Amino acid sequence: MIPSPTVTEALCITGGPRSGKTGALVERAAAWAEAIPAGPVAQPPFLFFCASPVTIDDTTSRLSQRGLADAPAEAAGPAKSAACQHGPRTSLCTGLVTTPFDYACRILADPLAQRATGRGGRVLSQAEEAVFYEDLKTCGLKRRRLRELWAFLQCGLVNLSDSDPDWIQTTEEQAVLDLARSILIFEEAVLPGEAVNLAVRALEAEPALRQRFGSPVVLADDYLLMSRASQRLVNLLATGKIAVAGSEKTALPAFEPYPCATGFAEFETAHAPLQRVTLEAPFRSLERAWEAAPDLAGEMALIARTIAEELAGGTSPDAIAVVGTNRTWRANLQRALTSVDIPAAPMRHPAFKAPKGDLAPASDNEREHVLRQLRDSITRPDDSHGSRACTRAGINDAATRNNPPASPCAGDSIAWRQWLSFDDALGRSAAVSELRRIAQPQGLNLAEALAALDADALPGLPATSPFTQSLLTPYREAQRLLAKRSGNDQPTIVTSPAAAANRARESSSSSKADTALSLANLTETRENDAAATPTSPAPAVAIAAPEDLFGHTFEVVIFGGFVNGFIPSRDMCDPGVIVGGARVRQEATDRDTIALAEQRATRRLLFTSFESCDLETAERLRLHIPRIRLRNGVRTCDIEPSNYLQELNLGIRQTSGPTDQSHPSA
C-alpha cells in the first residue's frame, strides 16, 4: 500500500460487533477536528468513509450531535462538490460522510483525473450495466464460462490486480478484458466496479488531486468490509491523520462484493508505528429460542402469531425483522402477513450486483426514462450555453486521437445503447458490435456513429446491411418521439454527412469545453431500488435476506425457514456436490449469516423451521429431501432442521401446535 507521505498519526480500532467502534471514531473525529487551525480552507476538515450507504445516516446523525456534520438528509452525495464551502473556519466546520464509491465518482469528475485515466463518461446504472453485459456476450464464450471469467476480472479490478503484469495469464482473459474496455470507451461509460480503481490510479498519477480532494483528517468505519481499492483510496486521501475501525471477525460483504480481509495488516505496514485500540463488546442478554411447525403453512402461522404477540405487547412493527434465505419463501410470508393485517414490507440493501440471466422486457416507465435522458442530452440549436450537451474530458493526445470529444448534438451514448436494447436485445448487441468495429477506428462514439449511419455517412456499413436496418429502426423511432413530445422545444440530432465526417478532427477546439464528467445517473440504481420499495408512513415488519440486516438493529429478529435446503443449501447437503475449499468457504458464509442475524437482534432471536412439505413445493423451493412419504394420497417430504442448529445450543426444541387451517397460508 502507498500511504500519503504527509500522514503524521495513524490509529486502528478493532473490536467485535457492537463494541462501540463507530462511537470511538466519532470521538476521535471531534478531537482531531478541534485541533485543526482556523483559517481559509479548500478541503473538508475531515472525511468519514462508511463501508455501505446504509450506515451513512446513522453516522451523520452521531456527528451532527457533536456539530461535526450536517443533518442526515444533507449527508455527502455523489453529485455535490467535495470541497468544504464554509469559508474561514471560526469554529468546528462540518466534514463529509460518504462511501469510497461516491467519493471516487467526485474525483473522476475532475478534468485532471480524466486526463490521468484517459476515461470520460458516466457511471452505469444497474439497468445499463445489464445491457453492457449483453454486449459482452458477443465474445462467443459460453455463458457460464463468461460469468466466471467476468467475476474474476471484476475481482481483479477492485483488488488493484491490474497493476500486476502477471494478472492476465490467458488469451481468453485478455480478449474479454479488451472487449469490455472497447465497449466502455465506445459508449463513454464507467462500470461501478471500476470507479474506485480509476480514482486510485488518478490519485497515484497526479499528486495535485490528493491536495484537491484530500483532507487533514480521514476516518473509515468497517474498514475490512471495503475492497482493497477502497482501502487504498482512503489512505491516499489522508494528508494529516487517519483512523480506521472494523471487526477482525469474518462477516458478510456489506456493499462491495470483494472485501479485503488483510486490510489491517497492510494498514499497519504502511503506517508504522501505529496506535492500536481494542474494544470489548459488552454482555448482551438476548433471548434465543427455536420452534418447529409440522408443515410450511404451520411455520408461517407460527411467525404471524409470534409477531402478533409482540405487537400486542407494545413492540413497534419496524422493530421486528423476519429473515429468510429463500426469496420465494420471503414473498409468500409477506403475503401471508399482509392477509392477516400485519404490515410487512421487503427490505432492500444496496450492493454492487453483477447482472445475471437475460434482460427483462422493458416497461413503459423505462422507455420514458430513457427518452428523457436523450432529450436532456441533445443540444437544442438555440442552446448557446450547451446546458444539455453531453460533455467529456479532454485527455492526452494519444487517447484523443482514438476518442475525439462527443458531439453536443448526438446525445448520450449510454442512453442510446439502452434504447437500442429494447425489444431485440440479442440482435441489437450483434448490430452494435458491428457498428463499433467500423466506427471506433474512425474516432466516433456510439451516439456519433448512429448519427453518421442515419445520414449514410459511415463507410463500411451500407444502408442495405441488416445491421443497419436493425439500428436505424429504433433510432428513427426515438427521433420521431422526441420531436413529437418536444413541440417547439424540439431537440434535433445533427445527421449531416459533413458533420459526421468531421467529428474525428474536432478534438483540438472541443476538448477545451469538454471538461465535465456527467454523473447524472450515478445514484440511479439506488433511486430505482427506493422507488421499487413501496414507502408508507405506517411502520411495517421488515422481510429481509440476511445480508439486508447490515447497518440496522431490531428488538426482535425471527430467522424463518431454518431448514436444510435453505441454510445450508440443497447442494451443501450433498457431500459430493460442493467439496474442498468451496465447501469450507460456503460453511463460513453460512455461519456469518447466522451470526449477523444474532448481532442485529437486541432483545429476542427466534429460529423457526417446518417438518414436512409436499413434494412439488419442496422441489420448487429446492429443499433437501431425505425421505418421501405418501400421506392421504399426497407425496410428502420430511424436512430436517438446519444442520447448524446443533451449533447454536438452543436446548430442547419447542414444537408448535397443529396448523390453523383458517390461516391464509394453510
Language model segments and positions:
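Conserved RecA-like helicase ATPase core segment
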Residues: 231-301
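Conserved P-loop NTPase-based nucleic-acid remodeling module centered on helicase motor cores
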Residues: 14, 41-152, 175-178, 266, ...
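Conserved helicase C-terminal RecA-like lobe
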Residues: 217, 221, 376-638, 643-647
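Accessory N-terminal region flanking or inserted into the helicase ATPase core
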Residues: 1-19, 23-24, 45, 114, ...
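Structural recognition of the conserved hydrophobic beta-strand(s) that form the central parallel beta-sheet
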Residues: 48, 97, 241-247, 607
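Catalytic acidic motif of RecA-like/P-loop NTPases
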Residues: 54, 223-227, 249-250, 547-548, ...
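Helicase P-loop NTPase motor core
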Residues: 4-42, 271-347, 359-364, 368-400, ...
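Catalytic P-loop NTPase motifs of RecA-like helicase/translocase cores
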Residues: 104, 220-234, 251-253, 551
